[in-house]
Regions:
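Non-catalytic substrate-recognition and accessory regions of acyl/acetyltransferase enzymes
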Residues: 1-64, 69-118
Length: 118
């Protein structure tokens, strides 16, 4: 398990954007595996910064709302950030992201939410 919790990692990278690494496996009580990157990314016709990328994720209890809860926490704590979910393979998860309001990136199995506020 990763030693750094997700929120400490994101806070440090948003506060100091030039500090490396910008990506890391992080810890969270609901997740076995959670890889996070804080970066800039072109989304919806603009370069967005910050973007919180989520990849290589595995819930401890799949199907119990861990992802929905994580997104709600991230939106509350980082309303200025986009959330990007990278390389989503299961079609059921893709459909769930769309129901949650995510937009699918053209030609990719990746999805994003724009900031709560810009």
């Amino acid at each position: 398990m990763a030693d750094t919790d997700i929120f400490s990692f994101i806070d440090s990278r948003i506060a100091r954007p030039n500090v490396w690494p910008r990506n890391q496996h992080v810890s969270h009580p609901d997740w076995k595996t959670l890889y996070v990157r804080v970066t800039k990314r072109p989304l919806d016709g603009q370069i967005r910064d910050p973007v919180i990328d989520l990849a290589n994720i595995e819930a401890k209890r799949p199907g119990r709302g861990a992802f929905r809860a994580l997104v709600a926490e991230l939106r509350k704590m980082y309303p200025q950030a986009c959330i990007f979910v990278e390389s989503v393979q299961p079609e059921r998860f893709q459909q769930g992201l769309l129901r949650m309001g995510f937009t699918q990136r053209d030609g990719e199995p990746s999805f994003y939410l724009l900031p709560v506020r810009t």
